[in-house]
Amino acid sequence: MASAADNSTKNGPHSGTIPPLASGDRLTRPEFERRYSAARNVRAELIEGVVYVQASVRHKQHGNPHFLLVTWLGTYIGVTPGVDGGDNSSIRLDADNEPQPDILLRIDSACGGASSIDEDGYLTGPPELVVEIAASTASYDLHDKLNAYRRNGVQEYLVWRVLDDAFDWFVL
């Protein structure tokens, strides 16, 4: 027969509680997705098995540069059949990586593109172009993310280092 102490362990205040995401957590992609789906008003990504919870976005260092690149790439999409894009869309790359790049362009899988859209609406596989606006995130955008994108077949990776007033365009 179970004691009261046994029941409090099974039905206590923390039973069924999903832990929050925190920067630096080391998680599998399924566990990351479980926690991310339970989070409210949190933007995070999983890079090489490490969680990065993203800070609020500043206008001059991120919001406006982001808007300019979305406008440019949106114009390209408008005149290029078979190409679509995403803004802060999660990408299921592999077991340790689910980045949420600022912008992506992809060739539709029916037109020969490498990515597809899962039944639950997530992008799976590498888009053809990934774009990041890097102010505070340049250290991992230019290292761990670059390596993950290269290893998973992203063809091109553009990083706008806003504070340095420089672009890095990698053909991977």
What are these regions (language model features)?
Residues 1-172:
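Gly/Pro/Ser/Thr-rich low-complexity, intrinsically disordered segments predominantly at protein N-termini
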